[in-house]
Amino acid sequence: MKKTNFTFMAFASGKESTKDNAVKRYTGVAPVFVLAVNPNKAELEKLYNTQLENDPEYLGEVEVGGDKHKVQNVRLDFIVKTDAGKCGGIEFTTKVAFFIRKEYRYNRDQTKVQVIDKYGRTAWVTVEQAKAHEIPVYKNGPANIDKDYRPAYHGEEELTNFIKAYLNIPNVMKYVNNTWVMVDKPEDCEARLESIAEYFKGNFKELRDVIALQPNNKVKVLFGVRTTDDNKQYQAVYNQMFLKNNITDYSKLDADLQERKAAGAYPTTEFTVGDLKEYDVESTDLSNSGAVGDMPFPAGDTAGGTPWDFGK
């Protein structure tokens, strides 16, 4: 019998198998430290223990409004790290990002502008009221804001709320005898950024100085996972509300999240209002995924002869 030897191999050498380098994602509420604000390339490489090709770009432009006019925009990245001791051993570094536009925030028909006072409180007033520094009166009474207010930049409210929670700044009002009154030392409650115009020039000293006031403080952040149309997943942050580190009741945070999601916000992001945990996508059960007839070719035990049947 004729003996036939065949060499049937066309493989590259491949790579040595190593440990799984899949990036983990997390959901839940976690206390975090703030490590840096808008760091440069060298600082980012040290924070993330990696090498970067390009310098980070924090300044840009966005098109807004029906007329698509361009407005200068700045991204503010607060690099944060979870407190592993309070997160079941989970430790990771990520960022909380804010976007500030170089324009004041108006309502849709441009009849009202958002204003912010020196205690970080906001309200909506008419343009005429803003010019006169009037306190607007709502159905339930006057707005909870001081006359010393100014127009707020688009995105400033969320940024201010983050800083107030991080610095653990108290409320300027207290409830006494069924009435809200100002605290005895309102100066301890001041919380307003005054150099935002400098951010659009690349000067972030004010923010770095603010964080340095309490370098060991923590703020609680709600993390989630965002899924893109091509099924890629990214770590996300709910930046509409932040909690002081001593807060353990998350009901207001959950209510705020549900209200915004009901209005159409965060449609592709999954949040879990609770303890921080690793995000786990349920695996698909392929053991009974279809009958043999659904396959593009016959099953192994019923298949015909292979076209490479060299034994014949």
Regions found by a protein language model. Give the residues of each.
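Short beta-rich binding modules
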Residues: 1-312
